[in-house]
Amino acid sequence: MEILMASSNLIKQLQERGLVAQVTDEEALAERLAQGPIALYCGFDPTADSLHLGHLVPLLCLKRFQQAGHKPVALVGGATGLIGDPSFKAAERKLNTEETVQEWVDKIRKQVAPFLDFDCGENSAIAANNYDWFGNMNVLTFLRDIGKHFSVNQMINKEAVKQRLNREDQGISFTEFSYNLLQGYDFACLNKQYGVVLQIGGSDQWGNITSGIDLTRRLHQNQVFGLTVPLITKADGTKFGKTEGGAVWLDPKKTSPYKFYQFWINTADADVYRFLKFFTFMSIEEINALEEEDKNSGKAPRAQYVLAEQVTRLVHGEDGLQAAKRITECLFSGSLSALSEADFEQLAQDGVPMVEMEKGADLMQALVDSELQPSRGQARKTIASNAITINGEKQSDPEYFFKEEDRLFGRFTLLRRGKKNYCLICWK
């Protein structure tokens, strides 16, 4: 389903997908793209040990440009991650130690790698780290060579920091205020090193991107461009990319492939076709045809399954997708025989509620401990009414004690009350 976007009208195609929030000098950029391949970059600051769904749109945008023949540079902010971007943040960020940030840099670099092709000839991707040019820069060089080109008058008028400057309880430190200069210099540096002429980022990055464009012009007399992707919103106004458990991460150890897949399955009908444009490489024609088919089928829409499949495969590969589908199918059917030990580990991580128990427990106690029932008395009635299954098998004896064979892989027992209420027992 992957499409190669023709370079000359790449911006138009991104706009058709709703992927362009703002762009500097669109005509000149379109003209530059029409002349042949360019190098472009997107920065990822290590503010945690994993990227999350919010990073996925700009990351996939880099991939879209690479598929159209351009050279992507993925910049991990080993230096900027030590400072903290104040853009549209209500409060000062907590500074992390150099060791922590370095650890996160390594993890994020590994996470970005599978999305881009680092070995495809002319337009092979490049991984860069801005610590390489800031790590040994002394303060006088910074103030004379970079600071001299920035007007504080303009900096305090940038939307991204305005609200912080106007709040008495939360000012802005000189550290975070100077972030804008660092990101600006990144652009100038990458322009000089790799001929980068375009920076892409989330729409909250507009102020930092335009600073980089100005600085590159002043330092190298080169015209460069910026393009921002929109911050993703949901039709109901709630925040995208969050669940009750917090952010949806790209690291399978922080959000399991099953939970990730389920996140997309639960997309609202009002959002799903838009999200297919943002997060997949299906053509607009394919997406429109799917929408038409769903509208006329008289059945539940297929779009959520297509979306979940495409994005889970992109992020977790074919194995991750197959595991997520297998777990989904087994929970739905109640038959657990196809589940592997690793599948149960995903469920224990974040797939269903989990409770740890000592061996020798009885079923009534398990139902109370797992909060599937409020009391032993209520548990007794529910068991007797034939509403409880153990590993998919009905159990109607209220006095039941767990046996060795109930412990799958010696560790796991899956309880279900009714059709949909699960709890996984992990035996100590």
Swiss-Prot record:
Subunit structure: Homodimer.
Compartments where found: Cytoplasm
Modified residues (N6-acetyllysine): K148
Function as written in the Swiss-Prot or TrEMBL entry: Catalyzes the attachment of tyrosine to tRNA(Tyr) in a two-step reaction: tyrosine is first activated by ATP to form Tyr-AMP and then transferred to the acceptor end of tRNA(Tyr).
Family: Belongs to the class-I aminoacyl-tRNA synthetase family. TyrS type 1 subfamily.
Short motif ('KMSKS' region): ranges: 239-243
S4 RNA-binding domain segment(s): 361-418
Main localization category: cytoplasm
Motif stretch ('HIGH' region): 46-55
PROSITE patterns documented for this protein: AA_TRNA_LIGASE_I, S4
MF annotations from Gene Ontology: ATP binding; RNA binding; tyrosine-tRNA ligase activity
Residues where L-tyrosine binds: Y41, Y179, Q183
Listed GO biological process terms: tyrosyl-tRNA aminoacylation
Protein name: Tyrosine--tRNA ligase
InterPro entries hit by this protein: aa-tRNA-synth_I_CS (IPR001412), aa-tRNA-synth_Ic (IPR002305), Rossmann-like_a/b/a_fold (IPR014729), S4_RNA-bd (IPR002942), S4_RNA-bd_sf (IPR036986), SYY-like_C (IPR054608), Tyr-tRNA-ligase (IPR002307), Tyr-tRNA-ligase_bac-type (IPR024088)
Annotated ATP binding sites: K242
EC number: 6.1.1.1
Domain of life: Bacteria
